[in-house]
Amino acid sequence: MKIVKNMTHIIDYQATQPISKTGETTFAIPSSPNKANLKLRISSRDSRNNRVELIATIGVEGITGTSQVLFRIFRDNIEVFNAQVGIESTDSEQFYVQTFQAIDQNVSSGTHEYSLTVENLTSGASAEVVGPLSFSALAIGKEQKCC
């Protein structure tokens, strides 16, 4: 009788937090097709039965109008996730903290670069990243062990 065990293990973990508090550092969200970009490198050993869990938190402020802000995550310049959010400005809900999670599955072996980008899709409206800003990637593998 064979007993097969599925073993989950951490392959790699990387994180960056360039802005830890609201207002610590701010920058305008560029109008599309330009983007603000934050990058991480993460290793993945086995191309079968693995995944990379990505988590981003971004504090934004509406400056003028209502901005449609697009957040994207790329692996090696290939988009693997996106989310769009409406950001209002003065006389409304002006500050937002967006947190989202993406799961990239069956990633090929090797080291990969993940990029988090943000861009404003609405001309005539403006928004800023005001913090906090963090981006993390956790590579998880699953092995099958026998007997």
Where are each of the predicted segments found?
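Terminal (often C-terminal
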Residues: 1-53, 61-66, 133-147
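Terminal beta-strand-rich extracellular "head" domains
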Residues: 57-111, 117-147
